Amino acid sequence: MRGPSDVLYNFHWIVPGEAARAAQAYAGFLGPFLTRHGIKSLINLRGPNPKFGWWRYERRISEAHGVRHIDVMLDSRHLPRRDMLVALFDAFDSAPRPLLIKCSGGQDRTSFAAALYLIHRDGWVAREKALAQFARFPYLHFPKQHQRWLQPFIAFAAGEAAGRPIAEWTRDSYDPARLKNWLEERGHHGTFKGIFERPVGSRWQW
């Protein structure tokens, strides 16, 4: 049964008992929230941000509860570099289970990462399940203009990988410039701001 904190933090299991997704745990309830679900590791898609209170709180509470805290940088409005996706797959491989994937709202970057998790875990046969992670309900994925590249990325990756495991393809061959060209060739102009360079430094974005 979903509790109040599950609704507040947009919590859902990706794979029950193994991997979950959520929003930033504001309002000071992160500790009980992690304990309630038995979370052993937290993958933070907002990257390392020690100058912001939310990051310091999240890191402190994770350590206090024996939860491994892993920082990975993704940007929902900019196409990821290869090293960013490699870091995400490395996090999937090393994170103790059950793991929790979260960004700010648990809607966009988290949907993207959850989809990649399923394909990484189960192979390309999980493509439809992966795409379901972008559903408006219950995940509240309502992408803004420059976030509309997130879901098409799955089709791009499937075509480029040609059956290879997604992490292997990413490490060996993924090129954000090819993704940019692929999107533009298919009429997805304006669905992203560019290729990621560096974080903007907004506490709400990151």
Language model region names:
Residues 103:
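Short cysteine clusters
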Residues 106:
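Substrate/cofactor-recognition hotspot
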Residues 1-99, 112-206:
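Cys-dependent protein tyrosine phosphatase-like superfamily
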Residues 109:
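Glycine/aspartate-rich loop-and-adjacent alpha/beta segment that forms the canonical ThDP
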